[in-house]
């Protein structure tokens, strides 16, 4: 039979274990909150990069209007912002005629922005696929894992 003294001893022995488990639970809960916050911030960065990419592509499309008539060629130029098609002398002459003194600044900014979007996408683990579209890898992975 358990006496009062032995029961108190068991309770006192279990109390530190219980407190330790509660501390572990609280630590785990804090890590979950940090992960949730990280995912929210990461999603905001992915959205920001996607937005800048859309602005970038819209600017390319706008500047090519009236300069290039072939829709397929426009698509190829937009899909490869630093591709060989951009080096075509005839295209550059038409772009210079359209943009005037802004041509060199525009081309410099286009190259710098493209490089920056690629670098940021790589650092954040975003995938750049055909058409220079930025995809949020985590969203694709979580959708696959939910099945």
Where are these predicted regions, by residue range?
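N-terminal amphipathic alpha-helical segments
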Residues: 1-136
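Solvent-exposed flexible segments
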Residues: 134-144
């Amino acid at each position: 039979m358990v006496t009062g003294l032995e029961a108190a001893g068991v309770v006192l022995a279990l109390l530190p274990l219980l407190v330790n488990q509660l501390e572990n639970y609280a630590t785990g809960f804090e890590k979950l909150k940090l992960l949730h916050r990280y995912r929210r911030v990461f999603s905001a960065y992915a959205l920001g990069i996607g937005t800048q990419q859309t602005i970038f592509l819209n600017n390319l499309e706008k500047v090519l209007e009236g300069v290039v008539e072939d829709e397929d060629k426009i698509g190829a130029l937009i899909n490869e912002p630093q591709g060989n098609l951009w080096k075509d002398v005839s295209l550059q002459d038409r772009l210079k005629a359209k943009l005037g003194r802004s041509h060199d600044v525009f081309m410099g900014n286009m190259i710098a922005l493209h490089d920056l979007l690629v670098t940021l996408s790589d650092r954040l683990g975003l995938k750049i696929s055909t058409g220079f579209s930025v995809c949020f890898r985590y969203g694709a992975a979580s959708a696959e894992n939910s099945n």
